[in-house]
Protein backbone atom coordinates (compact mmCIF):
# COMPACT_ATOMS: atom_id res chain seq x y z
CA UNK A 1 0.00 0.00 0.00
CA UNK A 2 1.31 3.45 -0.97
CA UNK A 3 -0.16 6.72 0.26
CA UNK A 4 0.32 10.35 -0.72
CA UNK A 5 -0.02 13.07 1.90
CA UNK A 6 0.59 16.68 2.80
CA UNK A 7 2.96 17.92 5.53
CA UNK A 8 3.37 15.14 8.10
CA UNK A 9 4.97 17.44 10.66
CA UNK A 10 1.41 18.34 11.74
CA UNK A 11 0.57 14.84 12.94
CA UNK A 12 -0.98 14.53 16.39
CA UNK A 13 -0.33 11.80 18.94
CA UNK A 14 -3.55 10.10 17.85
CA UNK A 15 -2.42 10.29 14.22
CA UNK A 16 0.82 8.52 15.10
CA UNK A 17 -1.06 5.79 16.93
CA UNK A 18 -3.21 5.24 13.83
CA UNK A 19 -0.14 5.06 11.59
CA UNK A 20 1.56 2.56 13.89
CA UNK A 21 -1.56 0.41 13.82
CA UNK A 22 -1.48 0.50 10.01
CA UNK A 23 2.16 -0.53 10.03
CA UNK A 24 3.61 2.53 8.28
CA UNK A 25 7.24 1.67 7.56
CA UNK A 26 8.63 4.40 5.30
CA UNK A 27 8.30 8.14 4.64
CA UNK A 28 9.54 9.86 1.47
CA UNK A 29 9.73 13.63 2.02
CA UNK A 30 9.83 15.68 -1.20
CA UNK A 31 10.13 19.11 0.44
CA UNK A 32 13.07 21.50 0.38
CA UNK A 33 15.71 21.77 3.08
CA UNK A 34 14.25 25.15 3.99
CA UNK A 35 10.76 23.75 4.49
CA UNK A 36 12.06 21.03 6.78
CA UNK A 37 14.22 23.43 8.79
CA UNK A 38 11.33 25.87 9.18
CA UNK A 39 8.42 23.50 9.74
CA UNK A 40 9.86 20.20 10.89
CA UNK A 41 9.55 16.68 9.55
CA UNK A 42 7.87 13.37 10.30
CA UNK A 43 8.49 12.61 14.01
CA UNK A 44 10.73 9.59 13.53
CA UNK A 45 11.85 9.90 17.17
CA UNK A 46 8.31 8.92 18.20
CA UNK A 47 7.63 6.45 15.40
CA UNK A 48 10.69 4.87 13.83
CA UNK A 49 10.37 4.57 10.06
CA UNK A 50 12.78 4.54 7.13
CA UNK A 51 13.00 8.23 6.22
CA UNK A 52 14.12 9.46 2.79
CA UNK A 53 14.54 13.14 1.98
CA UNK A 54 14.40 13.89 -1.76
CA UNK A 55 14.07 17.65 -2.30
CA UNK A 56 12.38 17.93 -5.69
CA UNK A 57 12.93 21.70 -5.75
CA UNK A 58 15.92 23.66 -4.44
CA UNK A 59 13.51 26.23 -3.01
CA UNK A 60 9.80 26.85 -3.08
CA UNK A 61 8.41 29.33 -5.58
CA UNK A 62 8.28 32.95 -4.50
CA UNK A 63 5.71 35.38 -5.87
CA UNK A 64 8.39 37.22 -7.85
CA UNK A 65 9.43 33.96 -9.55
CA UNK A 66 6.01 33.21 -10.97
CA UNK A 67 4.79 34.78 -14.23
CA UNK A 68 1.25 36.12 -14.42
CA UNK A 69 -1.30 33.53 -15.51
CA UNK A 70 -4.96 33.95 -16.26
CA UNK A 71 -6.07 30.47 -15.25
CA UNK A 72 -5.23 27.81 -12.70
CA UNK A 73 -4.57 25.40 -15.56
CA UNK A 74 -1.94 27.62 -17.19
CA UNK A 75 -0.16 28.28 -13.89
CA UNK A 76 -0.08 24.62 -12.93
CA UNK A 77 1.21 23.52 -16.32
CA UNK A 78 4.04 26.05 -15.96
CA UNK A 79 4.72 24.80 -12.44
CA UNK A 80 4.66 21.11 -13.33
CA UNK A 81 6.94 21.54 -16.31
CA UNK A 82 9.35 23.32 -13.94
CA UNK A 83 9.15 20.52 -11.37
CA UNK A 84 9.80 17.85 -14.00
CA UNK A 85 12.71 19.83 -15.43
CA UNK A 86 14.38 20.65 -12.12
CA UNK A 87 13.41 17.66 -10.02
CA UNK A 88 12.88 14.79 -12.41
CA UNK A 89 15.88 12.94 -11.00
CA UNK A 90 14.42 13.13 -7.49
CA UNK A 91 11.07 11.81 -8.70
CA UNK A 92 12.93 8.96 -10.41
CA UNK A 93 14.79 8.25 -7.18
CA UNK A 94 11.50 8.15 -5.28
CA UNK A 95 10.08 5.63 -7.74
CA UNK A 96 13.17 3.51 -7.25
CA UNK A 97 12.80 3.61 -3.48
CA UNK A 98 9.14 2.62 -3.71
CA UNK A 99 10.06 -0.28 -5.99
CA UNK A 100 12.68 -1.65 -3.61
CA UNK A 101 11.20 -0.77 -0.21
CA UNK A 102 11.65 -3.57 2.29
CA UNK A 103 8.05 -3.24 3.43
CA UNK A 104 4.85 -1.31 2.91
CA UNK A 105 2.73 0.64 3.61
CA UNK A 106 4.73 3.74 2.86
CA UNK A 107 3.85 7.37 2.27
CA UNK A 108 5.32 10.14 0.13
CA UNK A 109 4.53 13.77 0.78
CA UNK A 110 5.40 17.42 0.26
CA UNK A 111 3.83 20.48 1.91
CA UNK A 112 0.31 20.31 0.46
CA UNK A 113 0.31 16.85 -1.11
CA UNK A 114 -0.60 18.39 -4.44
CA UNK A 115 2.20 19.49 -6.76
CA UNK A 116 5.42 17.58 -6.12
CA UNK A 117 3.46 14.75 -4.53
CA UNK A 118 0.72 14.91 -7.14
CA UNK A 119 3.24 14.58 -9.95
CA UNK A 120 4.91 11.59 -8.32
CA UNK A 121 1.50 9.98 -7.82
CA UNK A 122 0.52 10.63 -11.44
CA UNK A 123 3.73 9.10 -12.78
CA UNK A 124 3.44 6.10 -10.47
CA UNK A 125 -0.18 5.43 -11.36
CA UNK A 126 0.54 5.79 -15.07
CA UNK A 127 3.43 3.32 -14.80
CA UNK A 128 1.02 0.90 -13.14
CA UNK A 129 -1.40 1.20 -16.05
CA UNK A 130 -4.11 3.23 -14.33
CA UNK A 131 -6.29 5.10 -16.87
CA UNK A 132 -5.83 8.86 -17.08
CA UNK A 133 -9.38 9.55 -15.89
CA UNK A 134 -8.69 7.80 -12.59
CA UNK A 135 -5.33 9.52 -12.19
CA UNK A 136 -6.93 12.92 -12.77
CA UNK A 137 -9.77 12.14 -10.35
CA UNK A 138 -7.27 11.13 -7.67
CA UNK A 139 -5.37 14.39 -8.18
CA UNK A 140 -8.59 16.42 -7.99
CA UNK A 141 -9.31 14.98 -4.54
CA UNK A 142 -6.55 17.26 -3.31
CA UNK A 143 -9.13 20.06 -3.26
CA UNK A 144 -10.63 18.35 -0.19
CA UNK A 145 -7.22 18.23 1.45
CA UNK A 146 -6.66 21.92 0.78
CA UNK A 147 -9.90 22.76 2.60
CA UNK A 148 -8.70 20.78 5.62
CA UNK A 149 -5.24 22.37 5.48
CA UNK A 150 -6.72 25.88 5.41
CA UNK A 151 -8.95 25.01 8.37
CA UNK A 152 -5.96 23.66 10.29
CA UNK A 153 -3.97 26.82 9.56
CA UNK A 154 -6.79 29.06 10.74
CA UNK A 155 -6.98 27.17 14.04
CA UNK A 156 -3.36 26.27 14.69
CA UNK A 157 -1.00 28.56 12.77
CA UNK A 158 -1.89 32.20 12.06
CA UNK A 159 1.45 32.51 10.23
CA UNK A 160 0.57 29.68 7.85
CA UNK A 161 -2.95 31.05 7.40
CA UNK A 162 -1.56 34.47 6.47
CA UNK A 163 0.94 32.92 4.08
CA UNK A 164 -1.83 31.00 2.34
CA UNK A 165 -4.09 34.04 2.17
CA UNK A 166 -1.34 36.18 0.64
CA UNK A 167 -0.17 33.62 -1.91
CA UNK A 168 -1.59 33.47 -5.44
CA UNK A 169 -4.72 31.36 -5.26
CA UNK A 170 -3.52 29.40 -8.31
CA UNK A 171 -1.24 27.65 -5.80
CA UNK A 172 -4.19 25.89 -4.18
CA UNK A 173 -6.12 24.61 -7.21
CA UNK A 174 -6.07 21.05 -8.54
CA UNK A 175 -8.32 20.88 -11.61
CA UNK A 176 -8.30 17.40 -13.15
CA UNK A 177 -7.74 18.77 -16.64
CA UNK A 178 -4.17 19.62 -15.68
CA UNK A 179 -3.30 15.94 -15.32
CA UNK A 180 -4.95 15.11 -18.64
CA UNK A 181 -2.94 17.86 -20.35
CA UNK A 182 0.30 16.90 -18.64
CA UNK A 183 0.10 13.20 -19.49
CA UNK A 184 -0.89 13.99 -23.07
CA UNK A 185 2.06 16.37 -23.35
CA UNK A 186 4.49 13.75 -22.05
CA UNK A 187 3.22 11.26 -24.62
CA UNK A 188 3.41 13.80 -27.43
CA UNK A 189 6.95 14.85 -26.57
CA UNK A 190 8.43 11.51 -25.45
CA UNK A 191 6.26 8.82 -27.02
CA UNK A 192 4.86 7.50 -23.74
CA UNK A 193 4.97 8.13 -20.02
CA UNK A 194 7.21 5.08 -19.73
CA UNK A 195 9.65 6.63 -22.20
CA UNK A 196 9.57 9.88 -20.21
CA UNK A 197 10.36 8.25 -16.88
CA UNK A 198 13.09 6.24 -18.56
CA UNK A 199 14.61 9.53 -19.66
CA UNK A 200 14.75 10.86 -16.09
CA UNK A 201 16.43 7.73 -14.76
CA UNK A 202 13.77 5.11 -14.05
CA UNK A 203 15.08 1.72 -15.18
CA UNK A 204 13.10 -1.07 -16.81
CA UNK A 205 13.81 -3.14 -13.71
CA UNK A 206 12.23 -0.48 -11.51
CA UNK A 207 9.12 -0.35 -13.71
CA UNK A 208 8.79 -4.13 -13.55
CA UNK A 209 9.30 -4.14 -9.78
CA UNK A 210 6.66 -1.45 -9.26
CA UNK A 211 4.13 -3.39 -11.30
CA UNK A 212 4.94 -6.69 -9.62
CA UNK A 213 4.67 -5.10 -6.21
CA UNK A 214 1.68 -2.80 -6.54
CA UNK A 215 -0.63 -4.31 -9.16
CA UNK A 216 -2.93 -7.06 -7.93
CA UNK A 217 -2.95 -10.12 -10.20
CA UNK A 218 -6.11 -10.87 -12.15
CA UNK A 219 -8.09 -13.63 -10.51
Q: What function would you assign to each model-found segment?
A:
Residues 1-107, 119-219:
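Cys-dependent protein tyrosine phosphatase-like superfamily
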Residues 112, 116-117:
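Ser/Thr-glycine-rich phosphate-binding loops at phosphate-binding pockets of nucleotides
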Amino acid sequence: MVYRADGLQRLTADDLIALRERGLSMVIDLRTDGEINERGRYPIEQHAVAYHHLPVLDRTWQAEDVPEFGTDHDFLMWAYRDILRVGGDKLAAALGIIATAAATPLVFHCAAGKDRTGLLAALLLSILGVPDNYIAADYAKTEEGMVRMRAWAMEQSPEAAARMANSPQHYYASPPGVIHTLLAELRQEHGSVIDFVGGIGVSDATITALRDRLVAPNE
